[in-house]
């Protein structure tokens, strides 16, 4: 059962025209530049396909329920009134910016939904901040998402300590700090801390290339999801992405091995 009164409602102000911001939140290349690789049939009733990690099990399919460019798009699972829905609203402001509003609805009632609600709320805050970085520093460009992901049956704080220790970066840096991974990381990783909250860092990077990155531990104690995600820009970003994914995916698997 879903609770119509329970939804995540967030907004962020980003630079750009409504048409530019629409492209960022309603089209496949735009969404993939700050969130996850996506394809969108740009019409009402069209298909949405999103890839949340390596493998077919991480592919999620949905529907374009409402398509009203450049101001409103709604994605859902395809069944009217059932499951989650994601409404994006774009409103122009003076000075060349727009407010992007997200309404994520369709949560179930009951305490068993609390962890998922809180986790998704925190995740959306992280990704909306990344949307702002995409528009602020890489306007007019398309980013390539690279999504190494690990899992660990440990507490979240323990996983964060293990991850940051292996990377050789501070566990609690301040915004504006410069950080760089140490020699044990599979590739270079260096940049400016743009956002720092418990167990989540967002970086504007210059290594392994221009772009943004997220270092995060999410989930619940005993089911920790570990991410070192990149959004790369530049003419060779697509060429560099497969090797980057392979190297970091292997590194995370070695750092957080699955018990026999």
Which residues does each PLM region occupy?
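Beta-strand/loop substructures that line and gate deep hydrophobic ligand-binding cavities in soluble
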Residues: 74, 78-120, 194-260
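Short, surface-exposed charged micro-motifs
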Residues: 11, 63, 87-89
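Surface-exposed beta-loop interaction hotspot
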Residues: 106-164
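Solvent-exposed alpha-helix faces
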Residues: 26-27, 129
């Amino acid at each position: 059962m879903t609770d119509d009164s329970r939804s995540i409602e967030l907004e962020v102000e980003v630079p750009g025209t409504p048409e530019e911001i629409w492209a960022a939140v309603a089209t496949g290349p735009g969404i993939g530049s700050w969130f996850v690789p996506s394809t969108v049939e740009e019409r009402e009733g069209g298909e949405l396909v999103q890839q949340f990690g390596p493998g077919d099990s991480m592919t999620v399919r949905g529907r374009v329920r409402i398509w009203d460019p450049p101001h409103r798009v709604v994605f859902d699972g395809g069944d009217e009134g059932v499951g989650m829905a994601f409404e994006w609203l774009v409103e122009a402001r003076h000075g060349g910016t727009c407010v992007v509003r997200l309404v994520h609805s369709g949560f179930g009632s009951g305490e068993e939904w609390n962890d998922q609600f809180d986790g998704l709320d925190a995740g959306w805050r992280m990704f909306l901040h990344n949307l702002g970085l995409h528009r602020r520093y890489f306007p007019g460009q398309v980013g390539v998402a690279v999504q190494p992901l690990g899992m660990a049956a440990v507490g979240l704080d323990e996983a964060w300590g293990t991850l940051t220790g292996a990377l050789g970066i501070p566990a609690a840096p301040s915004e504006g700090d410069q950080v760089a991974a140490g020699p044990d990381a599979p590739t270079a990783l260096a940049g400016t801390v743009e956002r720092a909250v418990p167990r989540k860092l967002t970086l504007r990077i210059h290594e392994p290339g221009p772009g943004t990155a997220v270092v995060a531990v999410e989930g619940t104690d005993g089911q920790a999801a570990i991410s070192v995600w990149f959004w790369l820009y530049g003419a060779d970003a697509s060429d560099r992405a497969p090797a980057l994914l392979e190297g970091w995916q292997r590194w995370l698997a070695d750092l957080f091995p699955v018990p026999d």
